[in-house]
Amino acid sequence: MSGEQELGITESKEHSPGEWYAEVVQKAGLADYAPMGGFIVTRPRGYAIWERIQNNLDGWFKDTGVQNAYFPLFIPESYLEKEKDVVEGFDPEVAWVTHGGHNELEERLAVRPTSESIIAPFMAQWTRSHRDLPMRLNQWCSVVRWEATETKPFFRTKEFLWQEGHTAHADEDGAWEETMTRLDQYARLYEEVMAMPPLKGRKPPHDKFPGAHTTTTIETLMPDGKTVQAATSHYLGTSFGEAFDITYADADEEENTAHTTSWGLSWRAMGALIMTHSDDQGLVLPPALAPDQVVVVPIWQEDNKDEVIDYAADLAAELDEADVRVELDDREHRNPGFKYNEHELHGVPLRVEIGPHEVEDGEATLVHRPDGETETVDRDGIADTVTDHLDTVHAKLYASAEETLEGEIREAESREEILGTIGQHGGYVKCGWCGDEDCEEPIKDAIAAEIVMVPLDRDEEPIHEDCAICGEDAEETAYFAKSY
């Protein structure tokens, strides 16, 4: 993938979403393919978006007692084998180091697919008393899972960036509260920062994290009707505490096993963001994540060049002073039309156009990236005005995504209805489910759709009395969908 190609998107999001997505990632300067299959190079603009996701979450984590740490990339095989469910769950995806230079290692080292097995032993070492709990650790790192056969930047890569949080608690209540706190923070990220409506739920028992008691999930719907598992938060019970001897002495000096959690969000969130908001003109970004929130474009003739550029520069400086991320595009070798197209391609949420008329009248013309809405406003108070317009851009993006989601949740009462509805429309189909994994198989085999979540509330009544597949009594509501 090379960035030195024709400016502008040539593929259609509606008709060729896969090709369109790859072209947006390429031409908006987000990523390049690495020489090894399944790996990508994240370019500065793409990494800047990830940094803003990271900064928001990192602040919220720290506000709620989390400390950052870093653990080794390599995990001894014996450590990985201590939790048998983790071994069984990840074994096909683990990359192994067998040699150091020309010498064969005494013990194979796994390139971390996830870090429970290397973090838990140290949590055990650092936990002695109930006063040491809760212990809340997080690390920002990359992991490797040798599963991607077709590279799709930010969606399917063998190596990906993420954060993984790991906590230990004295009891189930504390650990479950932690699990839900992190799930709520992920939902907040999608709503307040990414302008995307999240669905919160649980994974069905057969699809929970290996070794977990309960896996909770954030699901987001893509325009092509597929869902993305956008973040997960796991209550691990005492399985890891028992496997790695994470114990503590309570107030009565009785030894107890700690309850643990883990939770994570990867750069798949970036893939979901790009897929949800972007269009046939290129990348569309919510203001909170845009590297440049505003671009100021002066439009001049030779006889008014200095006056127009000075006016635009003063306006840009005022926005910068107000902590708006702003770029002044006063390049002389590019015409205004080229600049407009380029900044639309790069996803800048708001464009400010300054020509001789704006200078003469003490105004500025604002153009919204998502829909091209244009408004001429007073120059006075421009920082407050621009901030209001950025809020409006976020609201537009959220409303559009919410409207799409609401129209893509349907119900079904039979296997045929599930197959027909997803086959025709995509999206989510809710139905009664008996809780048996076998009832998922005919849907998965026929159209590659599966149960992506069930309601968080275990006491919630199922949407229908009978299981849509086998006809037995329904235990809960299942959401079927195709997924990335």
Curated annotation (Swiss-Prot):
SMART domains on file: ProRS-C_1 (SM00946)
Catalytic activity: tRNA(Pro) + L-proline + ATP = L-prolyl-tRNA(Pro) + AMP + diphosphate
Keyword terms, alphabetized: Aminoacyl-tRNA synthetase, ATP-binding, Cytoplasm, Ligase, Nucleotide-binding, Protein biosynthesis
Annotated GO biological process: prolyl-tRNA aminoacylation
One GO CC term on file: cytoplasm
Pfam family membership, one: tRNA-synt_2b
InterPro entries (alphabetical): aa-tRNA-synt_IIb (IPR002314), aa-tRNA-synth_II (IPR006195), aa-tRNA-synth_II/BPL/LPL (IPR045864), Anticodon-bd (IPR004154), Anticodon-bd_dom_sf (IPR036621), Pro-tRNA-ligase_IIa (IPR002316), Pro-tRNA-ligase_IIa_arc-type (IPR004499), Pro-tRNA_ligase_II_C (IPR016061)
Disulfide bonds, paired cysteine numbers: none
Cellular compartment(s): Cytoplasm
EC annotation from Swiss-Prot or TrEMBL: 6.1.1.15
Main location, first listed in the record: cytoplasm
GO molecular function, one term: proline-tRNA ligase activity
Domain notes: Consists of three domains: the N-terminal catalytic domain, the anticodon-binding domain and the C-terminal extension.
Similarity comment: family membership: Belongs to the class-II aminoacyl-tRNA synthetase family. ProS type 3 subfamily.
Primary role: Catalyzes the attachment of proline to tRNA(Pro) in a two-step reaction: proline is first activated by ATP to form Pro-AMP and then transferred to the acceptor end of tRNA(Pro).
Quaternary structure annotation from Swiss-Prot or TrEMBL: Homodimer.
Protein name per the record: Proline--tRNA ligase
